[in-house]
Design a protein with these regions (language model features):
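N-proximal low-complexity "stem/linker" segments adjacent to membrane-targeting elements
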Residues: 1-25
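Short, acidic, metal-binding catalytic loop of nucleotide-sugar glycosyltransferases
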Residues: 24-33
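A conserved acidic beta->alpha catalytic loop
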Residues: 39-50
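Glycine-rich, basic loop-to-helix element that forms the pyrophosphate-binding segment
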Residues: 67-83
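Donor-binding/catalytic cores of nucleotide-activated saccharide
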Residues: 72, 95-206, 214, 218-230
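Short aromatic/hydrophobic "clamp" motif used to bind/position activated sugar donors
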Residues: 88
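Catalytic core of nucleotide-sugar-dependent glycosyltransferases
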Residues: 211-220, 226-254, 270-303
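Membrane-interface aromatic/basic loop that binds lipid-linked glycans or pyrophosphate carriers
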Residues: 279-342
């Protein structure tokens, strides 16, 4: 039996209202794809039934896995454990893929695999779909990556603060995810950052297509990236940030300057996001948590890594003078209006 080109993992938790749209877009890949629907202990709706329905209807494509509730990360872990595809992509059940772009990506991957030049990481654009005002905007990487050719870290350009590789933009080779030993924490939101970050040192070759593949739904009141929800769940953001501080030794990457620079950029962004939502909380307890996070970074990284983050982008959100917090929050509000990232 020929190996599937790609495994799509779809963690589902009480997703009956919208998961069908997601699944139907993935089915457009046909027999090239394996679709793993992970029912994460859903009890409030027909999610388990829908998973089984698709598995019965498309037995050579769809697998349904039912697990005790473990959170989004455990859904991703479950997908990796069971994946048989050469590549692995996570698609959240309220998001979807553009079917035309998907056909082009899969055709290119098939060509690269046939030639023996399959990359460790395939990158595409993603699109924020804002339901509250019907607008959308695309995050693309044309200023960072060469297009339509295999490249390495030495060919990577500069990331702007509003640009990061997110789960939405990446397809990893499944063996890369297994080789890096990544296990996402259970019952924790925002683990998609770990999913992108931890495997990066194991990526030697990449390929970028300037296609708007992933459609990222923004607008549900209970969504994990909703601002008020993020403030309430800030402890989970801190847990993920600490995990990322610990999971890779950036000083071991000095021979890969651009890889190390990007991972410093990503970790700086995580520190900045944590700072902002602790500032939005505004309590004395949150202020202590902010101090504790920076102390954790100091104690668990080298002086060089700490300085790079503290006096770089990560430190912009931790201004040591009166009204510094107000300036940071004001800057966040302006950026949110411009980039509409949540």
């Amino acid at each position: 039996m020929q190996q599937k080109l790609i495994t799509f993992a779809v963690p589902c938790y009480n997703s009956a209202a919208y998961m069908r749209h997601c699944i139907e877009t993935l089915l457009s890949a046909g027999e090239q794809a394996e679709i793993i629907l992970v029912d994460d202990g859903s009890v409030k709706d027909e999610t388990p039934v829908i998973c089984d329905e698709y598995a019965a209807k498309y037995p050579t494509i769809v697998k349904a896995i039912h697990q005790e509730n473990g959170g989004h990360g455990e859904g991703v872990n479950q997908g990796i454990r069971n994946a048989t595809g050469l590549y692995y992509k996570v698609v959240d059940s309220d998001d979807w893929l553009d079917t035309d772009a998907l056909q082009k990506v899969l055709a290119r991957l098939h060509t690269l695999v046939t030639r023996g030049t399959a990359p460790d990481l395939m990158i595409c654009n993603y699109v924020y779909e804002h339901t509250e005002d019907g607008t959308s905007h695309t995050v693309r990487y044309t200023n960072i990556f060469p297009q339509e050719r295999l490249f390495t870290w030495m060919h990577v350009g500069h990331f702007r603060p509003d640009q990061n590789l997110l789960m939405h933009s990446v397809m990893y080779r499944t063996e890369v995810l297994r080789k890096c030993g990544m296990v996402l924490p259970k019952h924790t939101f925002y683990v998609d950052n770990i999913f992108v970050y931890q495997p990066l040192p194991f990526v030697k070759t990449m390929y970028y297509m300037d296609l708007d593949l992933y459609r990222y739904f923004i607008g549900r009141a209970d969504q994990s990236v909703n601002e008020s929800v993020m403030v309430k769940r800030v402890d989970q953001q801190l847990r993920v940030t600490r995990h990322m501080i610990d999971c890779q030794d950036l000083d071991a990457l000095k021979g890969e300057k651009k890889l190390r620079a990007y991972m410093l950029h990503y970790l700086s962004m995580m520190m900045a996001v944590s700072d902002i939502f602790l500032l939005l909380d505004g309590s004395a307890e949150a202020k202590e948590k902010q101090k504790g996070l920076w102390q954790y970074l100091r104690e668990h990284t080298s002086a060089a890594v700490y300085r790079s983050i503290r006096f770089g982008f990560g430190g912009v959100t931790n201004l040591p003078f009166p009204k510094g917090d107000a300036i940071v929050v004001g800057g966040y509000r302006i950026a949110r209006k411009i980039f509409k990232f949540n």
